[in-house]
Each structure stands twice: as structure tokens, then as C-alpha cells.
Regions:
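Alpha-helical structural signal in soluble globular domains
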Residues: 61, 65-70, 94, 98, ...
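Alpha-helix N-capping/helix-start residues
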Residues: 19, 24, 56, 148, ...
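Catalytic alpha/beta core domains of metabolic enzymes, predominantly
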Residues: 127-128, 139-247
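A general structural signal for well-ordered alpha-helical segments in protein cores
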Residues: 27, 59, 63, 88, ...
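C-terminal alpha-helical cap/extension of soluble enzyme domains
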Residues: 5-16, 37-39, 199-202, 206-295
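Short, amphipathic alpha-helical "lid/cap" segments that border enzyme active or binding sites
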Residues: 28-31, 148, 281-288
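Active-site beta->alpha loop and helix N-cap motifs at the rims of alpha/beta catalytic domains
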Residues: 3-143
Length: 295
């Protein structure tokens, strides 16, 4: 690895929708709000952005509009993963051609590749682009997890700069940091693990919660980077009930419900995702109130 991308709190941005398509005015407002709130990077069209149910034309327009609007103020990273290596290459090339600062590539889902296959997959994608690539490890969704040895092999590639680690395994994170050293960044892929990952030497978080508490997530990582670990721990604990509520149903269902309550965007989702149950919505709203989260 020879390129850096960002250090801090990146938001895994939702894709605002209407029943008829993408809500671009809401997306524009969200981007400005995040930049003003200290968000360090924008991650588009990934899990939280419902990338799996966007059309090719929608993806292209979201990427092009967002990059033009951001105009270099923060890095824009695009989710380009697929369980088909050729598709991941094509999506990554298109994002880079549009001006993305980097790509986020999830481990191939459903196929359940071997570790050797994972190395070949990510290497093929990284070979095809001239921008930084972040591996995204989320075995709860994909059915496969990278090992620290796989990360160590991938870290030798000049374009592979780190991993968004959402396995929840601190043993894996520690082993990865030990094996890969400072040249390979580890971002927490779970909001609840942010302070702990940063305290171990992680580069920050790619956050769902930042969609509604961007300033708080930015402050959390900054406290860690300033070695104010006890303060960071207290802030992590304060946010913990809200973070748990944001995952009482599968992401991004709760975060869109929270954002709709705040007037940030609608809670429109695309099937097979659907609206929250009333019971879970009440739980989420109570957690928001307890944490002082409002429009």
C-alpha cells in the first residue's frame, strides 16, 4: 500500500428515494450537511445506500452529481462490490472514471470464495483501477470472512489501502494491525466498535449512525486520535443505546426511519426491504429522544 484515503469518520450515506426514483434535492442537502458537520468522507452506493437495488443509470447519476457537488472538499468513495469479479471491475472503473477518490469493494457474497480466491478477486479489481481500494469485510451479510493473512497479502498491492472491518472480531482486527503495520488502514465497520478500533490504532469508522449524528461520530474519533480514551469511551457508551436501536432491524431500514423523523429524507425503501414494524419504530424513536437526537 502506498496511498492514503481518509482518517476519521466517513458516513455510509443513505440514498434518499421517492416512490418514483432518487430524491436528488434531499441528497444534495445531505451532502452539504455532512461537510458542514465535519464528516471526513462520503461513501456512496454501498450497503446503507442500497447499492444492490439501484439501477445502472441511477448509480451513474448519483456518483456524477455527488462528485461534482463535493468538488474535492472531502473524499468520495463508491461501493463497487459484486460477487462477479468482472462486474466489480467494471463498476470500479466507472466510479474512478467519474472522479471517485476510491472504491469500497465488499467480499464476494453467496459464492463463498476461498481465501486464495479472495486474494485473486481483490487483486484483479485493484489491478484494474488507479485509485485506492478499501476491502469491505462483513461476513454476516456475505457468508465469508477474510483472514489476517489474506489482508497481509492484499496489503502488498499498491492500490489496496485498508479494510472496513465489520466482522466484530477484535482478534481478527488485532492480528490484522500486527501483520499489516501502519501502511494498511483498518476502519471500524460497526459503529459500536469505533472507540475500541481507534484505540487499537484504527483509522476511524465508516458509519451508519453518522447519517443522523455526524458531529458526534466525528468527535468520537477525534477524541481517540487525541488519546483522550476515557472521554471517547464515555461518548461511545452514551451513543450505545442509539446505535443498538439503529440495528434492531436490518440496515438501512432503521436509519431511514430515523432520518424521516428528522426531516432529512423520506423512509422510502426498495423491496425486498420494507418499512419498520411499529414496535421497533417506537423503540428507535425512544432511543433518539434519550440521546437528544432531533432535526
Amino acid at each position: 500500500m502506498s496511498q492514503s484515503l481518509f482518517r476519521g469518520s466517513g458516513v455510509a450515506l443513505v440514498t434518499p428515494m421517492t416512490p418514483d426514483g432518487i430524491d436528488f434535492p434531499a441528497l444534495e442537502q445531505l451532502i452539504e450537511w455532512h461537510i458542514a458537520s465535519g464528516t471526513d468522507a462520503l461513501i456512496l452506493c454501498a450497503t446503507t445506500g442500497e447499492g444492490a437495488t439501484l439501477t445502472y443509470a441511477e448509480r451513474a447519476e448519483i456518483i456524477e452529481r455527488s462528485i461534482r457537488q463535493v468538488n474535492g472538499r472531502v473524499p468520495v468513495i463508491v461501493g463497487t462490490g459484486s460477487n462477479n469479479t468482472a462486474s466489480a471491475i467494471a463498476l470500479s472503473r466507472e466510479a474512478c472514471a467519474a472522479g471517485a477518490d476510491g472504491v469500497l469493494v465488499v467480499t464476494p457474497y453467496y459464492n463463498k470464495a476461498t481465501q486464495r480466491g479472495l486474494v485473486r478477486h481483490f487483486t484483479a479489481v485493484a489491478d484494474a483501477v488507479d485509485r485506492p481500494l478499501i476491502v469491505y469485510n462483513v461476513p454476516s451479510r456475505t457468508g465469508v470472512s477474510c483472514t489476517a493473512e489474506t489482508y497481509a497479502a492484499l496489503a502488498q498491492h499498491p492500490n489496496i489501502v485498508g479494510v472496513k472491518e465489520a466482522s466484530g472480531s477484535f482478534a481478527l482486527i488485532q492480528e490484522t494491525l500486527n501483520l499489516c503495520g501502519d501502511g494498511f488502514s483498518v476502519w471500524s465497520g460497526n459503529d459500536e466498535d469505533t472507540a475500541a478500533v481507534c484505540a487499537l490504532g484504527g483509522a476511524g469508522v465508516i458509519s451508519v449512525a453518522a447519517n443522523i449524528v455526524p458531529r458526534e461520530m466525528h468527535r468520537l474519533v477525534e477524541l481517540c486520535f487525541a488519546d483522550r480514551i476515557l472521554e471517547a469511551g464515555r461518548e461511545q457508551l452514551r451513543l450505545a443505546p442509539l446505535i443498538r436501536a439503529l440495528f434492531c432491524e436490518v440496515n438501512p431500514i432503521p436509519i431511514k426511519s430515523a432520518m424521516a423523523r428528522m426531516g432529512l429524507c423520506s423512509d422510502v425503501l426498495r423491496l425486498p426491504l420494507c418499512e419498520m414494524s411499529e414496535e421497533n419504530r417506537a423503540r428507535l424513536f425512544a432511543a433518539m429522544d434519550a440521546c437528544g437526537v432531533s432535526a
